[in-house]
């Protein structure tokens, strides 16, 4: 774009959705607005707030990189900002390569915030060797368009340094700077008691392979107000629809599974919007578990938290921010949350926050980016706008046959059926003028010469939750 002194800068942000997007829970889950993990929205919303200034407007680009969109981005935006988490991992290699294809076609600056490499706790990068060329190409493309690249912590910095990259800065994660230079956190009570409100979080692998299931089970037996906070799309589907096509959904040790006692007792939640997530955690006394952004959400709510680290991605971030943490492999499955709470020291986190914040905004300035705390209102207008929105509530277990809950779900199903019917009508209209059976088959797809019915498509979208609820004996 041409640079005019009086024109506001247009910043394109890689994020699943804008913080100001509202809609139904069903639509959010169907579109997967948080890219399989709601923790992604914690840091993308923080980046959106931090980078919004009187001279900069921020726009969400979605998660998927589309190289064919490069020319439009060049014409419409002034800078592309890419907040990332553990992007240097084998399962993310293909999306990373697509992102590189897009970036190589951009003529505007590209700034990466907080990218991380994922490896075992011992910081052994051997498992990343097969994707080294993909990482090299990505980092080189970014550094051709920025002064430096921001990484999560020490391990990722060393990983890139070993490849020969020098313009690498450790900045942590933007989520920790949501509220600027100050970070207030104190233990609001003495030792935890049976009446304490405790939040717990954990991935499927931590629950299945690292003993977190036993820790949760014991905590559930002792603390009546324990609540599990889920983060994955499959967990949201299990909570809202009672089923998911993902194979991990069959793991009954997860509190998000319908057979789990915490599910049946309505002691599980998942949040689409970080502002709702953080807001509901404010009344809790402690948070713990293996999810780094699940615990960061609690810290931002002023709730003492301890992270149970299972790999380098969480460990390096905890070390950088001095977040209380334990290696999950060294935590006995008999540990009581009260022990973690008592041992947690937040002095380093609180006292070192301003220095880390200044380092972060220094990185932004070196890359030509303003921030709301130095150049704006500290996010006041952003927060006020969020406060005025009617955001969807937490996703919670679907138990019972509450008419309101049924109405919302059936209403969404009906709208989806109408959309699919309209889409089918369009396809049939396009096919009506065709006389060649071969042409019809090509248009429809491989292996079949008939259009999928609305009913079949709807079933693929929602599965069988309604029938299972109405006929539980099946």
Which residues are covered by each model-predicted region?
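Short linear elements at protein peripheries
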Residues: 473-474
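Active-site anion-handling motifs in enzyme catalytic cores
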Residues: 1-470
């Amino acid at each position: 774009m041409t640079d005019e002194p009086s024109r506001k800068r247009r910043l394109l942000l890689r994020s699943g959705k804008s913080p100001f997007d509202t809609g139904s829970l069903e639509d959010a889950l169907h579109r997967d607005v948080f890219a399989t993990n709601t923790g992604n929205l914690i840091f993308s919303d923080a980046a959106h707030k931090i980078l919004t200034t009187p001279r900069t407007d921020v726009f969400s680009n979605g998660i998927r990189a589309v190289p064919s969109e490069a020319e439009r981005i060049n014409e419409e935006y002034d800078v592309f900002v890419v907040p990332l988490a553990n992007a240097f991992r084998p399962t993310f290699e293909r999306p990373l390569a697509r992102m590189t294809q897009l970036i190589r076609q951009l003529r505007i600056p590209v700034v990466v915030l907080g990218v991380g490499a994922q490896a075992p706790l011992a910081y052994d990068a051997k498992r990343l060797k097969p994707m080294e060329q993909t990482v090299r190409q990505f980092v080189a493309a970014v550094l051709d368009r920025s002064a430096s690249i921001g990484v999560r912590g020490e391990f990722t910095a060393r990983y890139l340094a070993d490849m020969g990259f020098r313009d690498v800065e450790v900045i942590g994660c933007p989520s920790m700077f949501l509220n600027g230079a100050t970070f207030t956190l104190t233990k609001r009570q003495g030792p935890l008691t049976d009446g304490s409100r405790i939040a717990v979080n954990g991935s499927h692998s931590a629950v299945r392979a690292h003993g977190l299931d036993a820790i949760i089970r014991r905590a559930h037996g002792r603390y009546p107000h324990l609540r599990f906070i889920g983060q994955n799309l499959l967990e949201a589907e299990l909570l809202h629809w009672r089923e998911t096509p993902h194979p991990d959904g069959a793991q009954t040790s997860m509190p998000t599974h319908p057979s789990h006692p915490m599910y049946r007792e309505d002691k599980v939640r998942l949040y689409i919007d970080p502002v709702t997530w953080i807001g509901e955690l404010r009344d809790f006394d402690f948070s713990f578990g293996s999810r780094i952004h699940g615990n960061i959400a609690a810290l931002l709510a002023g709730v003492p938290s301890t992270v149970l680290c299972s790999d380098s991605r969480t460990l390096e971030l905890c070390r950088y921010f001095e977040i209380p943490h334990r290696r999950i492999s060294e935590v006995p499955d008999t540990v009581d949350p009260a022990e973690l709470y008592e041992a947690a020291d937040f002095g380093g986190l609180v006292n070192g926050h301003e220095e880390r914040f200044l380092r972060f905004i220094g990185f932004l300035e070196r890359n030509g980016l303003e921030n709301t705390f130095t150049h704006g209102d500290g996010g006041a207008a952003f927060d006020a706008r969020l406060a005025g929105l009617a955001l969807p509530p937490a996703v919670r277990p679907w138990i019972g046959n509450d008419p309101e809950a049924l109405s919302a779900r059936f209403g969404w199903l009906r709208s989806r059926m109408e959309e699919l019917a309209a889409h089918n009508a369009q396809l049939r209209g396009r096919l009506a003028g065709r006389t060649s059976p071969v042409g019809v088959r090509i248009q429809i797809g491989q292996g079949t010469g008939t259009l999928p019915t609305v009913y079949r498509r709807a079933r693929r979208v929602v599965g069988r939750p309604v029938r299972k609820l109405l006929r539980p004996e099946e």
